[in-house]
Design a protein with these regions (language model features):
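PLP-dependent amino-acid enzyme catalytic core
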Residues: 1-227
Length: 227
């Protein structure tokens, strides 16, 4: 149902062209800003003040976290019992929602996050026991470049067993596997959890046979495939 409510989307200037075109396709109002958290926040505040729009944070908003948790909920409803679930971690919204939904439905399920080695702020945060901001990330996974928020961090630190980091090379291998064997178009960020599950580190874990992997997005520029 169309409600004719305008949507204002703040995006970094270096956002992939395919993502900008997708937002334009939904007729949203795009405002580009410098690719920093400070610039995004300031631009968002200016737009909200000017238009009176309700601000929806992309991952730290509780309603967004709840909505993303339905991915895990539907997977468990369809498959049933799982030994473990793995999902990518960027801002942490999807992983947080996954933790809450999965833990309420399968109390003993083991929860793992997956991150690129070149953007491993969540991994560093979990190991050090405090929120570590992202610092100069370098990875092909443009969807996982942002830092976690306070809300997502507080959820993840209480529920994740571990975060497994993978190289861009491992991510590309996993991405190719999904394209070729499953015939699904995914972006590099989406391949991160499969890459994590394929690592010796994960394979050496005991008592894990049935694994749920959440595939998160296909915003890929076909002219710039990494393989």
């Amino acid at each position: 149902m169309k409600r004719n409510i305008p949507a204002h989307i703040v995006m970094p200037r270096n956002a992939p062209k395919v993502k900008i075109q997708a937002v334009e396709g939904y007729r949203a109002n795009i405002t580009l800003c410098e690719p920093t958290l400070k610039a995004r926040r300031e631009t968002l505040e200016k737009i909200a003040e000017k238009t009176g729009a309700y601000v929806v944070h992309p991952f730290n908003e509780p309603k967004v976290i709840a909505g993303q948790g339905t991915c895990a909920m539907e997977m468990i409803e369809d498959i049933g019992d799982l030994d473990a679930i793995c999902a990518p971690v960027g801002g942490g919204g999807l992983m947080s929602g996954t933790c809450i939904a999965a833990r309420s439905m399968l109390p003993n399920v083991r929860l793992f996050g997956a991150e690129p080695k070149g953007a491993d702020d969540a991994y560093q945060s979990l190991k050090k026991g405090k929120l570590i901001p992202q610092n100069n990330p370098k990875t092909i996974c443009d969807g996982l470049l942002t830092s976690m928020g306070e809300n997502t961090w507080n959820i993840l630190k209480d529920h994740l067993e571990d975060i497994i980091t993978v190289s861009d090379e491992e991510i590309v291998t996993a991405m190719k596997l999904i394209w070729e064997r499953m015939k699904i178009i995914i972006e590099p960020s989406c391949a991160t959890p499969l890459a994590a599950v394929l690592t010796p580190e994960f394979r050496e874990l005991e008592n894990i046979e049935t694994i749920g992997i959440i595939l998160t997005g296909g915003n890929v520029d076909l002219s710039k495939l990494p393989f």
